[in-house]
Amino acid sequence: MPTPNKAASVAELKDAFQSSNAAVLTEYRGLTVAQLKTLRRSLGENAQYAVVKNTLTKIAANQAGITALDEHFAGPTAVAFITGDPVESAKSLRDFAKDNPNLIIKAGVLDGKALTADEIKKLADLESREVLLSKLAGAFKGKQSQAASLFQALPSKFVRTAKRFASSSPSRAVPSNSARALIHAA
């Protein structure tokens, strides 16, 4: 029979799994308290980094519908519950792991899909959501300005062609009054 404290911990962890966009399991063996504090700061407000008990976390993950991480709950485990941009948090974890080789990224879950350590590192290599959105907006803006210049060029090109036609062969065709007005207006 679980104790009330353990039941409360499982409920809290289950809520963390359900309310986060992503969760990354890490092994923190050999890291000092100061290094863990630095890691928490680097993750920022969009992620909560918690040292957890494997059994309770495994139960909470299963209750939240996440069973793909079961094999990774071994050894000293901590979980980064990510509520913001998963790319930024993955970058923070990757960069911290480069500087502190004792931090090992084990696995993770993103929107219910299990991720390997390599997939998390690939996620960290992506540009942030804001950068990708700004690139997309820039691409749309560029296409709109190209279309606008094309539409502006069509009438002026027509008028230039009509002027050339009128000046090159006055004997072949006599422009109508409306065509003359259009040519003189340009």
Curated annotation (Swiss-Prot):
- Keyword annotations of the record: Ribonucleoprotein, Ribosomal protein, RNA-binding, rRNA-binding
Q: Name one Pfam family in it.
A: Ribosomal_L10
Q: Which PROSITE patterns match?
A: RIBOSOMAL_L10
Please provide, in alphabetical order, the Gene Ontology terms of the cellular component aspect for this entry. Answer: large ribosomal subunit
One BP annotation, GO = translation
Drop me one GO molecular function for this one: structural constituent of ribosome
* SUPFAM superfamilies registered for this protein in UniProt: Ribosomal protein L10-like
InterPro entries found in the cross-reference section:
Ribosomal_uL10, Ribosomal_uL10-like_sf, Ribosomal_uL10_bac, Ribosomal_uL10_bac_type, Ribosomal_uL10_CS_bac
* Family affiliation: Belongs to the universal ribosomal protein uL10 family.
Function (record text): Forms part of the ribosomal stalk, playing a central role in the interaction of the ribosome with GTP-bound translation factors.
Subunit structure of this entry?
Answer: Part of the ribosomal stalk of the 50S ribosomal subunit. The N-terminus interacts with L11 and the large rRNA to form the base of the stalk. The C-terminus forms an elongated spine to which L12 dimers bind in a sequential fashion forming a multimeric L10(L12)X complex.
Q: Which NCBIfam families match?
A: PRK00099.1-1
* Protein name, as recorded: Large ribosomal subunit protein uL10
User: What organism does this protein naturally occur in?
Assistant: Streptomyces virginiae (Streptomyces cinnamonensis)
Q: What is the lineage of its organism?
A: Bacteria, Bacillati, Actinomycetota, Actinomycetes, Kitasatosporales
Q: Which gene encodes it?
A: rplJ
